[in-house]
């Protein structure tokens, strides 16, 4: 154990003219020393984007918090979410940050811009492993956390 703590904050802003936000963040405590944070981004904006991003973040955060394997979580999402017929992309993308004991973080990223990590006041290019799960390109990273990351 260490003296680090995780500070989690976010702000969702609706697209101009929309009543709902197409992004959704879900934070779930998983046991005493584990937190799962999921950012899901629904394609476009409005009701459809909001529903799909909420569905995505809720399914993933619940499954990850219950300790299910990454492959099963992604397979479930891939089977659940529709694919845009004109663009051929999923209607929702996601980034997962799984913080364990405030010591390490597992980053799992699908089709979102990569997480930007600032370490020692500079951009830190952390290692990423590319995985293919059910035809989806997933990036996974495991990081040892440091003060002020």
Where do the PLM segments sit?
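Catalytic core of PPM/PP2C metal-dependent serine/threonine phosphatase domains
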Residues: 21, 52-121, 132, 138-140
């Amino acid at each position: 154990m260490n003296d680090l703590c995780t500070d989690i904050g976010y702000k969702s802003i609706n697209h101009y003219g929309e009543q709902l936000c197409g992004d959704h963040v879900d934070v779930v405590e998983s046991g005493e020393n584990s937190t799962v944070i999921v950012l899901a981004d629904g394609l476009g904006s409005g009701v459809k984007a909001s529903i799909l991003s909420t569905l995505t973040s809720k399914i993933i955060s619940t499954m990850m918090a219950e300790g299910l394997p990454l492959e099963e979580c992604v397979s479930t999402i891939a089977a659940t979410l529709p694919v845009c017929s004109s663009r051929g992309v999923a209607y929702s993308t996601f980034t997962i940050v799984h913080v364990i004991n405030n010591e390490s973080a597992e980053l799992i990223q699908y089709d979102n811009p990569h997480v930007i990590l600032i370490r020692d006041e500079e951009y830190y290019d952390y290692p990423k492993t590319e995985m293919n799960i059910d035809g989806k390109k997933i990036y996974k990273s495991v990081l040892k956390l440091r003060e002020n990351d």
